[in-house]
Amino acid sequence: MAASTTLALSHPKTLAAAAAAAPKAPTAPAAVSFPVSHAACAPLAARRRAVTAMVAAPPAVGAAMPSLDFDTSVFNKEKVSLAGHEEYIVRGGRNLFPLLPEAFKGIKQIGVIGWGSQGPAQAQNLRDSLAEAKSDIVVKIGLRKGSKSFDEARAAGFTEESGTLGDIWETVSGSDLVLLLISDAAQADNYEKIFSHMKPNSILGLSHGFLLGHLQSAGLDFPKNISVIAVCPKGMGPSVRRLYVQGKEINGAGINSSFAVHQDVDGRATDVALGWSVALGSPFTFATTLEQEYKSDIFGERGILLGAVHGIVEALFRRYTEQGMDEEMAYKNTVEGITGIISKTISKKGMLEVYNSLTEEGKKEFNKAYSASFYPCMDILYECYEDVASGSEIRSVVLAGRRFYEKEGLPAFPMGNIDQTRMWKVGEKVRSTRPENDLGPLHPFTAGVYVALMMAQIEVLRKKGHSYSEIINESVIESVDSLNPFMHARGVAFMVDNCSTTARLGSRKWAPRFDYILTQQAFVTVDKDAPINQDLISNFMSDPVHGAIEVCAELRPTVDISVPANADFVRPELRQSS
């Protein structure tokens, strides 16, 4: 992208204007004139041609990738090249903790509102990092009166007596930086009261752009007398804390984070956001916008991060057992392989190494699975992205949160279990006899389906104009380094239900869609012995994303996350061992 189209993070309107002024990418073929999400009335062949045109085009076709530059007076900014696109990052490390008081200049209290997935991790990491920096900034937890989370916060060392635990509204009013980490649905229902309690010139910190999407859908915006920033760890809260603790002796390890400055009233926002990210232990921090973040994040959770991987292992397990495979072997060839050897290989060496590790016969089976699965996966992913971007999925989350309680004479409908079927009971048995450090088998068909899903998600985000750092973190790194290890440890619910309410809802909603489309379209194509789409295989082999992943791999956490079955850093209701 030309230098003249570099975009300022603090001015979203400037971003939109610059994007409009940027050189236009070549026009996509007319076949993509209808979105997949509304293509039910179009013939299947036409839908396939539309998606084929989308994939066959060079990666540059589609929305232009923004060049998100930023200025910092505290930390060192580095330029990296990802697939030919220049981006800027800040490396983390405990050696940077002495810079935190300068980054947080003018802040006396950081209020952490909520104690769900991210709250406990971020509060403890911030407290510990600031203590190491010998800062007198107070990290205070704010909870609603009567919350059961008070006991959990006290157990983590936050107390009323020390002024580090208290009422939500007192905490919001008394904080210079308010980290709003309650559920997205709760944010949507309470934002007006939260805004009214914030001090002028204070800073609102978000770890998800959901609230912006909700406000946009209502034609609203944030108050103009506060700064609005985001630091969004690319992993669940328990991973953020676990890797921070594991990395204490080796200059830090944690979860990569994106950051955004949506509104800056006094020029401090960028350094505060970067300080927040460094204090969380982020190995590297990359820039995004609040809008790009919520679109990629909500979409990613429903895709390969949670929902789609759940859907494909259910579909594959059923396929293998119907073909006569032993149940335990079927579980090993699906869940164990994806969360073990496949994730480990992608994390350290990339997707191509998964393919190159196969025998010649295995590569043929991989190609069949990849060729048959890519377009069906993209079909659902494309629909999901547009549901998020249009606000439909955001509205769905808000309404679902309200159904958790009795209303209008109807009963409450909280989230139900997702690990009570035969497959997941078999998984308990497999894990009970699994040798230590066993990574499961590399099944070529499973690998082909999983990698096809990953590449389809990468392609949708790329065509929608997301930066490579965001694409790779939301489609690859978060999946293999943060989330899959939890499913490997104790099954799908242990992975999904340690995440946010928005992620848990989305995973439950979209997982069946991936299961269905793979069963009805991809596997049927394989069973018919349909020709392999050699263009798809060739595009996979030569895709520039592989080089970008190599660069990101050099910035990965310095340790691998360890998730024991009896982990005590997860949600309280999930702490009992299987």
Swiss-Prot record:
Its main location: plastid. GO terms for molecular function: ketol-acid reductoisomerase activity; magnesium ion binding; NADPH binding; protein homodimerization activity. Its cofactor is Mg(2+). This is Ketol-acid reductoisomerase, chloroplastic. GO terms for cellular component: chloroplast. Its EC number is 1.1.1.86. Residues 289-437, 438-574 form the KARI C-terminal knotted domain. The active site is at residue 208. Homodimer. Residues 1-52 form a transit peptide. Binds 2 magnesium ions per subunit. Residues 90-288 form the KARI N-terminal Rossmann domain. Mg(2+) 2 binds at residues 297, 474, 478.
